[in-house]
Amino acid sequence: MHIPQLNKYNLSFPHPNEANEDGIVAWGGDLNPSRLVRAYQSGIFPWYAKDDPIIWWSPNPRLIMELDDFKLRRSLKKNLKKFTYKFDTKFQEIMQKCATTPRNHQDGTWINDDIIEAYTVLHGQGIAHSIESYIDGVLVGGLYGLSIGKVFCGESMFADVNDASKAAYAVLIKHLKLWGYEFVDCQVPTNHLKSLGAKEV
């Protein structure tokens, strides 16, 4: 199947229904903030290895977290008080931590310098956000993502201490409910997020 190349001077994307069986919609283009917002509004996101061209994805099925489906297990609920939490105070550091955290079955990271630079611009525009977990003032976990309408698009998380990222996620879910959000777009299915209550749609 032919995968279309994006025009650098045109922000439009193919329809997500035109993605190939792997979920790839297009390749090329750039990480212009306006293009990124247009992509996420269409259910499309960039995900590519360091030396590859930009690849744009819209997986089907994809993983979402309905806010009422989040499973706050007793052990995690007990550990929530171990941490203090902040929003949007160390966005770039959160991204860098997510980029350098070793992950099972993953060689390297897709969170490269260009991604960090582009999403930091979105953070400055009030579109990308971080939630951070601290112990005694030290950053020990957190996550980041994008706020698109009433959907939070979760990107990545890290934990230097057990449950630090899960706790940040639990606090995020609580606030998203208060703010009237509908769900978290988790994008690619993972067993970890499924264990917290996410489902494929």
Give residue ranges: language-model regions.
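N-acyltransferase acceptor-side catalytic subdomain
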Residues: M1-V201
